């Protein structure tokens, strides 16, 4: 499952580094410089991982910083949705 997701994202030049996938945001402050990807147990599906790991790559590309404004957050979210849609269309 995760190998397929990582291979797809690599085609789009998204190479996630130093991350942990967790079902809870309780670990956020413990992570430090490591990206934390939150996926609820019932939501652990390929297309959701594509979306969330894409956000991790966006975070890496931005110098490990979250979106600095609502507009930036919205742009990142729209981009992640487009990447997820591409994955879903190719998976059919």
Segments from the language model and where they lie:
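Short intrinsically disordered terminal tails
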Residues: 1, 89-92
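Zn2+-dependent metallopeptidase catalytic core
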Residues: 1-17
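Short non-domain terminal segments
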Residues: 6, 26-27, 85
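Glycine-centered secondary-structure boundary/capping sites
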Residues: 10-14, 62-63, 92
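Active-site scaffold of zinc-dependent metalloenzymes
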Residues: 14-46, 56-60
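Post-HEXXH active-site segment of zinc metalloproteases
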Residues: 32-34, 42-43, 47, 59-90
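Histidine-centered divalent metal-coordination motifs
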Residues: 51, 55
